[in-house]
Amino acid sequence: MLIWSKKVHLICTEKKLLFSGIKLFNMEATNIYSIASSYLQWLAPGRAKQRFKRFLWKLAPGKMSEIMPNNTKQEFAIGMYRGDLPFELDDVGFNPVLTHADVNDVPAAFVADPFMIQADGTWHMFFEVVNRATEKGEIGLATSSDGKCWKYQRIVLTEPYHLSYPYVFEWQNEYYMIPEGGRAGGGVKLYCATSFPERWKCIGNILSGGRFADSSVFRYEGYWYLFTDASQIAESPLLRLYWAKDLLGPWNEHPASPIIEGDPHIARPGGRVLVVDDKIIRFTQDVFPVYGSKVRAFEIDELSLTTYNERQVGREAVLGAGKVEWNSGGMHHIDAHMLDDGKWIACVDGWFSRV
């Protein structure tokens, strides 16, 4: 059941649509969808239709999936991009480099959320593998000597709940990982490699209670910072920022947090946070009008324990739907690394619709 008691004033100049004073009380979601669909059918594609969809999202973000159902089945795969800057990258031309078909130890539905790290001359990529048998995400591993050709190794981390977004990093000669734990409500857990890259142990909970998605940690001027989507509603992300002196905490919420509230275009983290030449770049996934639409970049101009300011890099997204099948639906993740020659390499993911 859904209760709407707001007056709505929406003028779409394209069709001169005036949708004013509508009240919907105790209506089934299917009935609301029928009303919304009747307007969307005669609104021409373009800005007017997008405005109407955004209005519906703002009015009831928690019910958006019921009002505007999306029957798209997304199949994700992993690719590699290269370029001169971390937010100016191009398809290397032989993508995807990893798909569900490469996974040989579990029946995989798709692969996504890649993070990589170089150790002893070898690239190690960790990523989400959705296991068809358990219908949960597990963390897989692939390796490469050149960042081009990748060989799947095995599943390296499983839990009784869904895992994804395996944010891997190195600190003081130790390898750590912060995977997302889905909607299990177990907080943000920190893992340490006991035998890198295949064996991992949870060493602590750095944030507890509630749902935390796509947690992204980085170190800046002697402190650890962590972005996370703390919304209880996946369709309406809430970007919170925390800081700590020590990796295991205690973690404190930043005075400027929440950084972004309720904006599906720029709130949810979309990959590794970069700190290069005293510049901080955060990537965000655009989850509107569908999950996995685009990736945008923001440069953080000011960050201290009490202040925060950022600006978007460019006017357009840095990643989006491609012209070939593997990422024709959209893209939602990036992990960029600088090479010895100053160029950049990134593992990314994209998706296409399947029946």
Model-derived features: positions:
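Carbohydrate-active catalytic/glycan-binding domains of CAZyme proteins
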Residues: 25-355
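Polybasic, lysine-rich low-complexity intrinsically disordered segments
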Residues: 7, 15-16
